[in-house]
Amino acid sequence: MTWITPKKAIMLAAAAEGGTKLNAFDNALLKMGIGNVNLVKLSSVIPAHIEWLDELPKNIPIGMLLPTVYAHIESDEPGSTISAALGVGISEGNEGGLIYEYAGYCKREEAEDMVRKMVEEGFKVRGWKLKEFKVVSAEITVKEKPAAAVAAVIMFPY
């Protein structure tokens, strides 16, 4: 297998219910348009000069391996609010960046605040200058069915 440094990326988030916690997770992936691919979990470094997409590319082959950073949480506890967030920091000159993920029993705003703090610290310890911060998040309150919140950065080699 040959790995290629990704050239494009997109930020996505969704929340969904399902018959089980795993089905809720799958349903959230389907809502995001990535339920029929294989997500390959990455750590959190963004390649230099990556292009950010506003929508998913068309005709992604079923089963395609897609490099992904994602946060997820599932719960079947009625009344619980769960959230997942990803924070993306882009460096000056777009020479690279960082992605941090968080998921927990909390409101969306708390998850977003957490990833912002993590991005800022990640840049500080590297001595990088933060030019731009982006965030994507999902929140859901569990009702009668299990629920999931998922946030992801999907990277594409083309």
Swiss-Prot record:
What enzyme category does the UniProt record give?
Answer: lyase
Q: Reaction catalysed? A: L-arginine + H(+) = agmatine + CO2
User: Where is the site described as Cleavage (non-hydrolytic) found in this chain?
Assistant: S43, S44
The prosthetic group or cofactor this protein requires is: pyruvate
**One Gene Ontology biological process:** arginine catabolic process
Q: From which source organism is this entry?
A: Pyrococcus horikoshii (strain ATCC 700860 / DSM 12428 / JCM 9974 / NBRC 100139 / OT-3)
Q: Please report a single Pfam family linked to this protein.
A: PvlArgDC
Q: What is this protein called?
A: Pyruvoyl-dependent arginine decarboxylase
> InterPro entries, per this entry?
Pyr-dep_his/arg-deCO2ase, Pyr-dep_his/arg-deCO2ase_sand, Pyruvoyl-dep_arg_deCO2ase
The record, for Gene3D superfamilies, names: 3.30.60.30, Pyruvoyl-Dependent Histidine Decarboxylase, subunit B
For this chain, the family text in UniProt reads: Belongs to the PdaD family.
Q: Which NCBIfam families match?
A: pyruvoyl-dependent arginine decarboxylase
Enzyme Commission code(s) on record:
4.1.1.19
- So which domain of life are we looking at? Archaea
* Residues found modified as Pyruvic acid (Ser): S44
The protein's UniProt keywords, in alphabetical order, are: Decarboxylase, Lyase, Pyruvate
Q: Which GO terms describe its molecular function?
A: arginine decarboxylase activity
Q: How is the cofactor bound?
A: Binds 1 pyruvoyl group covalently per subunit.
List, alphabetically, the HAMAP family matched.
PvlArgDC
